[in-house]
């Protein structure tokens, strides 16, 4: 059976062309500098959720799809499962400060590595000596070992509530 076509609606894109181009250059440079297989980035306007830029390295040219591997035809920015990395640290720090378990000036002794009770060793990205650091300093340097100590001050149920509050595990609407 045939279904008669109906007129569609007007679509207004929120992509900022200049920002899109700058972000694409930055991602391409980062991929090259880090010898990475690929890279993606998204810029979202806080408050509205509007997508201002969304880029994937090795994006296909729609006019010449044959020149790009089919592995790059989708958008990894919205489809590829990746670890959230250090972006997840914001949740733990926010919960700790908001719940008054720590303040930005609370200090911790922060070693390069920590062995967890289960035997797993967690270390920071770059080697460093043991440092006395504030919570603000730990966040600024993105130290995993400091994060663990801040996280120990926040109950698991509270951190879970904050994760849900930040929208983790929810669809973004871009899918």
What do these predicted ranges mean?
Residues 15, 45-86, 91-175:
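Beta-lactam-recognizing serine transpeptidase/beta-lactamase-like catalytic domain environment
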């Amino acid at each position: 059976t045939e279904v008669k076509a109906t007129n569609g609606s007007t679509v207004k894109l929120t992509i900022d062309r200049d920002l899109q181009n700058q972000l694409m250059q930055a991602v391409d440079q980062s991929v090259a500098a880090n010898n990475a297989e690929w890279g993606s980035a998204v810029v979202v306007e806080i408050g509205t959720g509007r997508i201002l830029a969304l880029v994937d390295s090795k994006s296909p040219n729609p006019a010449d799809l044959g020149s790009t591997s089919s592995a790059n035809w989708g958008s990894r920015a919205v489809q590829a499962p990746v670890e959230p990395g250090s972006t997840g640290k914001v949740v733990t720090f926010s919960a700790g400060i908001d719940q008054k378990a720590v303040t930005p000036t609370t200090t911790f002794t922060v070693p390069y590595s920590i062995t967890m009770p289960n035997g797993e060793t967690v270390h920071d990205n770059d080697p460093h000596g043991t440092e006395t650091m504030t919570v603000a300093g730990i966040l600024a340097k993105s130290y995993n070992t400091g994060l663990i100590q801040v996280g120990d001050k926040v109950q698991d149920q509270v951190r879970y509530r904050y994760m849900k509050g930040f929208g983790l595990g929810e669809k973004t609407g871009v899918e």
